[in-house]
Swiss-Prot record:
Alpha subunit of the heteropentameric ligand-gated chloride channel gated by gamma-aminobutyric acid (GABA), a major inhibitory neurotransmitter in the brain. GABA-gated chloride channels, also named GABA(A) receptors (GABAAR), consist of five subunits arranged around a central pore and contain GABA active binding site(s) located at the alpha and beta subunit interface(s). When activated by GABA, GABAARs selectively allow the flow of chloride anions across the cell membrane down their electrochemical gradient. Alpha-6/GABRA6 subunits are found at both synaptic and extrasynaptic sites. It is a multi-pass membrane protein. It comes from Homo sapiens. Heteropentamer, formed by a combination of alpha (GABRA1-6), beta (GABRB1-3), gamma (GABRG1-3), delta (GABRD), epsilon (GABRE), rho (GABRR1-3), pi (GABRP) and theta (GABRQ) chains, each subunit exhibiting distinct physiological and pharmacological properties. Binds UBQLN1. Belongs to the ligand-gated ion channel (TC 1.A.9) family. Gamma-aminobutyric acid receptor (TC 1.A.9.5) subfamily. GABRA6 sub-subfamily. GO terms for cellular component: cerebellar Golgi cell to granule cell synapse; chloride channel complex; dendrite membrane; GABA-A receptor complex; plasma membrane; postsynapse; postsynaptic specialization membrane. GO terms for biological process: chloride transmembrane transport; gamma-aminobutyric acid signaling pathway; inhibitory synapse assembly; signal transduction; synaptic transmission, GABAergic. The lineage of its organism: Eukaryota, Metazoa, Chordata, Craniata, Vertebrata. This is Gamma-aminobutyric acid receptor subunit alpha-6. It comes from the Eukaryota.
Amino acid sequence: MASSLPWLCIILWLENALGKLEVEGNFYSENVSRILDNLLEGYDNRLRPGFGGAVTEVKTDIYVTSFGPVSDVEMEYTMDVFFRQTWTDERLKFGGPTEILSLNNLMVSKIWTPDTFFRNGKKSIAHNMTTPNKLFRIMQNGTILYTMRLTINADCPMRLVNFPMDGHACPLKFGSYAYPKSEIIYTWKKGPLYSVEVPEESSSLLQYDLIGQTVSSETIKSNTGEYVIMTVYFHLQRKMGYFMIQIYTPCIMTVILSQVSFWINKESVPARTVFGITTVLTMTTLSISARHSLPKVSYATAMDWFIAVCFAFVFSALIEFAAVNYFTNLQTQKAKRKAQFAAPPTVTISKATEPLEAEIVLHPDSKYHLKKRITSLSLPIVSSSEANKVLTRAPILQSTPVTPPPLSPAFGGTSKIDQYSRILFPVAFAGFNLVYWVVYLSKDTMEVSSSVE
């Protein structure tokens, strides 16, 4: 009996302690409920804090959980963020056992909240699964923290003059929809450097690198007053890998391939013609496919200029062969005319002693196609019987063909145009590439955003 007494005392003490905790817990919850009831008693959520008096300051900051994708065709981007707003409402001050009241989204509809909207947003979604993704806290001094998880689809104006070596500053603009500057102002909670956070793992872009972000604020005027606009600029630099593989390398290889025709024999007309036409069609196909990933802008981009110059080189190679073929034919015709006037005629005279059978015959040459008729020598008039005797005695005429003059080395060798083209075309194309890449890669192509205030 004496040994069980200490255990009995311990059990009674534990029951007493647990009872006190339960009573304190019930008292705490009842006290918090009483605090909320007192806060909402006589509270009008239609009026902003300090209505008719001081300006309400709304402090904001943004945490980006996912950035991308970015659409060049639609000129827009998408991101998932935690959008936080903090302001002070003197009507919600309280005292009690707790310093912070952590409440759910049901409380949001019962108090005043800023009417913030995204000015350049095309579509914004507030997540509601499994419950509305909202955080709401009230501090003892009346400071309120209101956080929402949003997916924002915003407009990103792009000027693609330097595409694909371009960079863009995609803005996110927000402010009050109804309250002018005289009633609500927005500020950055953590200053201009730390109010927008974008972790490295949050950026999942295929064609861009997110190299940083800057913030600014401005005041705009409208018919209904002056409004404070907060802006975040997300700086994006385009990646070159895709376009080097799909556009630039095929264009360079096509131009080099077109210049191979300068080394093909000028007499191979079908081969060089097919070569030139095929490379021209290839460049046409590349230029069409390059535009598929771009909006229909009215100006030329850096890639358009490169493709245009490559197309000019390929087309010039085809024109070069046309010139070679033309001048080759011209030289051929000149050679034929020279051969016509330089070749001596073949004289054929019968071996008979009679002078009546002399006749000059100029035989046509099969290669130069030169024909000329020579009038036979006049024969004296004789009787038919004598003529028959003469013709019977006349031997068969024999002729010696004219040997055509040999072709000159310049006519049968490589064209001078081809010789010059073998040097000029590669040098010119290499010079163009040198200037093109030095200019664009050393150029600051990032769009300039507004200055930070």
